[in-house]
């Protein structure tokens, strides 16, 4: 028997979102970010769908291991690893698997070049990451032309791409900063191309850039959270119709009467305000359903929304059904998703947790049953 708590990836909705992104950005290439297990949606299933349908042109990962897992799943699309790779064995494994690496300084360039030499590979494509304002990883813009020349000067390397990242493109408060970043990136790319010739792929736009900043689109865009149906920020422009990429459901395991004045759960933090019935569902923070939802989250049962009663436990959570329950053991409980007119979105859960949609889906743990449906 499968674990009754199920994360269901809605591949048709994810494809719809990618089609909407394509329609918005025109003839630019699309790189789908599938790092962190496709933001908790299942990287193999999502990537296989993307390759099968042609919904995107590239995939993006955070680690070499993530890229290798996609290759093991039969995915042959181009894969870009976003951050530099410092481990020699990882560089070698990446090149053997055809994973495109990012470089940020002379050391990372030399490391890829040495691996290419050792493997007798030629025309090994790399992407040079430039820091235009994130202040996290990347070459300084003033240093980028010299680094590009270093890449171009190595007989086994090819500078395929130049890219940067936007820290506040999803918020109107950051519009001017984003425009400044786009201008700096354009100037830096022009300086690079003046020295080494045309660069095939210049890319800057993330989800916020796709939604609200056409000046960031360049040759390729790199959407992330919007692929999976959520806005990167509640204030982000809604310029693409997005459908939810995931449902999280379980089934009621127990129902019992609770008298007015009785308490429920650890710490006795919830007191029944009237005679009621409380349902238990087999999901908790051990499944990635955050304890921050204690006494504030809701679930959908039978097309109606009900509140969490007490603290979310490691493996179970209690729900106040009210004095006249229609629910019974075995009935479905929806933690993320829609039934009838009642809906709980990833963004709803994120707001209650005081976090972002990215974290909500990334928290889902391996013991939750996984399904992927069209």
Can you name each region flagged by the protein language model?
Residues 2-15, 19, 23, 66, ...:
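Active-site anion/phosphate-binding pocket segments in diverse small-molecule metabolic enzymes
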Residues 5-9, 13-15, 26-203, 217:
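Active-site-proximal beta-alpha core segment in soluble small-molecule metabolic enzymes
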